[in-house]
Amino acid sequence: MVIVNRNVDIQNSSTERSTINFANKIILAPMVRVGTLPTRLLALDYGADIVYTEELIDWKFLKSFRVVNDALHTIDYIDKTDGTVVFRTCEQEKKRVVVQLGTSDPKRALMVAKMIEKDVAAIDINMGCPKQFSLKGGMGAALLTQPEKAKSILSTLVQNIKVPITCKIRVFEDVEETVKLAKQLESTGISALGVHGRTIAERPQHPNRCETIKKVAEAVRIPVIANGGSREIENYKDILQFKAQCGASSVMIARAAQGNCSIFRQEGLLDLEEVIMNYLKYSIDYDNSPSNTKYCVQNMLKELQETPRGKKFLECQTLGQIWLVTFTFIKM
């Protein structure tokens, strides 16, 4: 049974928070379904400086209530309609976790930010997601073509929220148009700007536009966080090379971390078996949903899912089954 307390914060959480510095950082990027608590904690263990959540939609937060989970020592935001966890965090990541918010409205964004600001290090507005769900809702990359609305959302948060506000964008075909937008967003007072080096229409198989990111970094004074280089990133040295190529202050890693979170280790990658076991320990310790745990492990196993043992893993339905089958899988 999950024990919750709606009134008392763990470790006397205070509204006074230190400012997170986005300069010269290696960061876990926001990733749908992947950026849940176990992955974030694992990334921090392996050397990530900052970790982003997956994109969380404003109305999902507004349908939730905040509780202190005394059993897990976490802060949970629970959906009022079905009891599922919208967002779970803990003291270990408190000063380094950034919630990425999907929103198209300044008022809703502010309502959510007021709810969560004492539990997070910063709040990021997603202005780069190219998925139809986001575009149809006026969120994500839809905001790239509505700079006034984008600025309104950011300004509202910067002026009313105590933690730093950032945003993440995609580039345009035209470099100057990208630079112009970056300057407009910077003018709102945001603390950093994440830049994915592909357009809305481009996908991971397309080359990352590192030169465009470099032009943005040269044009603004705030830290620019380069993103989109995972195709060429196989180790920590590659991360630094990507950073230099983009001329960026910091780097944000997505797919390379999804496949093996130890990409953040300066000492080099760990065996996938060890990474999976460490991930599963966090999943069990923090009661991560079996479906999400299974999805994240599948992204690590990749083609190994097609082996007989991999197919057995796909049949798992509970955390206990996942642990048992995975433990057997990696020992054989």
Feature names for model-found ranges:
Residues 56-62, 106, 127-141, 197-202, ...:
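Conserved radical SAM core fold
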Residues 76-90, 94-165, 170-178, 183-186:
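Active-site beta->alpha loop and helix N-cap motifs at the rims of alpha/beta catalytic domains
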Residues 30, 55, 101-103, 127, ...:
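A cross-domain feature marking catalytic cores of carbohydrate-active enzymes
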Residues 59, 143, 172-175, 199-206, ...:
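Short, small-residue-enriched loops and turns at beta-alpha junctions
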Residues 53, 122-130, 187-198, 250-257:
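Non-cysteine beta-strand/loop elements that form the S-adenosyl-L-methionine
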Residues 69-70, 74, 95, 132-150, ...:
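Glycine-rich tight-turn/loop motif centered on a GG-T
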Residues 2-20, 31-115, 314:
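Glycine-rich, positively charged N-terminal anion/phosphate-binding segment
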Residues 1-27, 32, 37-38, 45, ...:
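Alpha/beta catalytic cores of nucleotide-metabolism and tRNA/nucleoside-modifying enzymes
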